[in-house]
């Protein structure tokens, strides 16, 4: 798929999800979580696409860069949204539990004090 088609596909996916979210009849309750996952995924793919377009220029920084470093800053920043606001894994767990009705992952009781939590425990 050519670069133009990839960009168009990215934009259309984001546009269709936003349109679906606006219609109350199609809301599931996990729109915010899904939007965050889609946004972080789009940022990662955009970074990869920028690298494909710029090639070796992608490693240049500041005034030496063809874009003045804007694309490079985006590339450095792109992993951050998948962490802040709850990791993508946490967002997927929320969607699974609240929207799809899947059981919660096993873990300690909510009332367990932090000091009593075991490190690296695997057999909850």
What are these regions (language model features)?
Residues 1-124:
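Alpha-helical interface subdomain recognition
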């Amino acid at each position: 798929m050519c670069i133009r088609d990839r960009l168009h596909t990215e934009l259309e996916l984001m546009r269709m999800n936003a349109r679906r979210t606006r219609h109350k009849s199609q809301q599931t309750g996990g729109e915010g979580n899904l939007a965050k996952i889609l946004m972080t995924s789009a940022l990662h793919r955009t970074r990869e696409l920028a690298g494909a377009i710029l090639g070796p220029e992608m490693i240049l920084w500041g005034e030496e860069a063809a874009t003045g470093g804007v694309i490079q800053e985006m590339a450095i920043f792109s992993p951050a949204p998948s962490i802040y606001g709850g990791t993508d894994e946490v967002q997927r767990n929320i969607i699974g539990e609240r929207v799809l009705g899947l059981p919660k992952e096993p873990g300690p009781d909510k009332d367990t004090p932090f000091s009593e939590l075991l490190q690296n425990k695997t057999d909850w």
